[in-house]
């Protein structure tokens, strides 16, 4: 057996190289032609049924508006019912023929089952499932007194998507529908203080890439990896080391630094266009894909940069991080941060 592996270790690299040299040019040409056809034949969602989790704010809210503009029927869920009703009213005004709202916690399997059942019972079908609900963190791993305090991140970000997808699959098969998965560029970036959040987003990518193989062409899956987009997370809403939701905009300044924060409306528009084309994946803003290339080619450089920018010496306040000093010294916040994320009015429920 060891001899076989030794042989494969020698043969596999050159064989793979020559195979790719022959395969990639026609493959890329075919993909280009398919992308043109997909753009020309984008799905029409008028009258179709879309369920969006985490729809009370941020990307989920604006995805509801984009679907509404295209005439889709909406089922919106989140923990904040009052905010959901406000989103629903706007969606109706924008053109959605029917909108229902459901208060739910996607970390609970029974809530996820109820969400899908109520959607199908009301509309009679389900065409798109948008798994968007998420919470973030911004604390060093060793500074968390009880690591179990961070369980809600994985339970919401990962298991919440797992539960809703499992209960929705049979209905999506019938409609040959689509799943939109909200991962993050943090799924590949080694960002300090976002360890469990990054793990939850990376787990989503692995799960849905595997699920794509299992379901084949019956259900389309679009994996979205947003960068910094205006949302409650970029407003500074994090799960604290004590397991409580808190708002800390100084810490947000450390984490985001002088990186431009994208428009949530533009992000949502890009996501829905990508979904209707049937794209496999989308990174928005697209320039964040270069960070993945850097990670592949020189991971040590990426890790060193993150350590230099975001970490401070032991006993030194987090606000002394180089990332925040750069932000403050350049005045980049006024240029790169939308007014919406500089508002102190952020709900923590």
Curated annotation (Swiss-Prot):
Its recorded reaction(s) are:
an 11beta-hydroxysteroid + NADP(+) = an 11-oxosteroid + NADPH + H(+)
Please report, in chain numbering, the residue ranges of the motif Proline-knob.
Answer: 13-26
Q: In which tissues is it expressed?
A: Expressed in seeds (at protein level).
**Source taxon at top rank:** Eukaryota
Binding annotation for substrate: 184
Q: Which keywords label this protein? A: Lipid droplet, Membrane, NADP, Oxidoreductase, Signal-anchor, Transmembrane, Transmembrane helix
Q: Where does NADP(+) bind?
A: 54-80, 105, 132-135, 197-201
Name listed for the protein in its UniProt record: 11-beta-hydroxysteroid dehydrogenase A
Q: What is the lineage of its organism?
A: Eukaryota, Viridiplantae, Streptophyta, Embryophyta, Tracheophyta
Q: Which family does it belong to?
A: Belongs to the short-chain dehydrogenases/reductases (SDR) family.
Catalytic residues in the record: 197
What general EC class does the enzyme of this chain belong to? oxidoreductase
The record's section on PANTHER family has:
11-BETA-HYDROXYSTEROID DEHYDROGENASE 1A-RELATED, RETINOL DEHYDROGENASE-RELATED
Membrane-topology annotation of the record? Single-pass type II membrane protein
Keyword Oxidoreductase in record: yes
